[in-house]
Amino acid sequence: MVRTKANSVPGSYRKVVASRAPRKVLGSSTSAANSTPLSSRKAENKYAGGNPVCVRPTPKWQKGIGEFFSLSPKDSEKENRIPEEAGSSGLGKAKRKACPLPPDHTDDEKE
């Protein structure tokens, strides 16, 4: 909190509210005419993604983005298979035995 002159007066309390800095007005005819060449120049030099600090090559195993959008007929069959075939690779079908936990003797040692 910021101290103000009002804080020094006993019995009075005043809170100072921070405000934002004024923003530039976009839309005036003179600034729009002047900024058009600058904005087109910025668009050419604008950073478009990746890591500008340490550029690394794409690994061979990584799929391209286009492969996710264009599925082959073979892949689309896998997507639309019957619900009984889909699932957790058969783990749910096998019955699992309940394994009780061994008794915890840490409480006995503390006493």
Swiss-Prot record:
Start-end of Basic and acidic residues biased regions: 74-84
Region Disordered, residue ranges: 1-111
Sequence positions bearing N6-acetyllysine: K24
User: Where is it found, in Gene Ontology cellular component terms?
Assistant: nucleus; perinuclear region of cytoplasm
Report the domain of life of the source organism. Answer: Eukaryota
The protein here is known as PCNA-associated factor
Q: In which residues does the motif Initiation motif occur? A: 85-97
Q: Where is this cross-link: Glycyl lysine isopeptide (Lys-Gly) (interchain with G-Cter in ubiquitin)?
A: K15, K24
Indicate where this protein resides in the cell: Nucleus; Cytoplasm, Perinuclear region
* Function recorded in the entry: PCNA-binding protein that acts as a regulator of DNA repair during DNA replication. Following DNA damage, the interaction with PCNA is disrupted, facilitating the interaction between monoubiquitinated PCNA and the translesion DNA synthesis DNA polymerase eta (POLH) at stalled replisomes, facilitating the bypass of replication-fork-blocking lesions. Also acts as a regulator of centrosome number.
Q: How is it modified after translation?
A: Monoubiquitinated at Lys-15 and Lys-24 during normal S phase, promoting its association with PCNA. Also diubiquitinated at these 2 sites. Following DNA damage, monoubiquitin chains at Lys-15 and Lys-24 are probably extended, leading to disrupt the interaction with PCNA. Polyubiquitinated by the APC/C complex at the mitotic exit, leading to its degradation by the proteasome.
Organism from which the protein derives: Bos taurus (Bovine)
Renumbered to this chain, motif D-box spans 23-34
Motif KEN box extends across 78-80
Q: Where is the composition biased (Polar residues)?
A: 1-10, 27-39
Listed GO MF terms = chromatin binding
Q: Which UniProt keywords apply?
A: Acetylation, Cytoplasm, DNA damage, DNA repair, Isopeptide bond, Nucleus, Phosphoprotein, Ubl conjugation
Q: What GO biological process terms are annotated to this protein in UniProt?
A: centrosome cycle; DNA damage response; DNA replication; regulation of cell cycle; response to UV; translesion synthesis
Q: What broad class describes the main subcellular location of this protein? A: nucleus
Q: How does it assemble?
A: Interacts (when monoubiquitinated at Lys-15 and Lys-24) with PCNA. Interacts with isoform 2/p33ING1b of ING1. Interacts with BRCA1.
Asked if the Swiss-Prot or TrEMBL record annotates the protein with the keyword Nucleus, the reply is yes
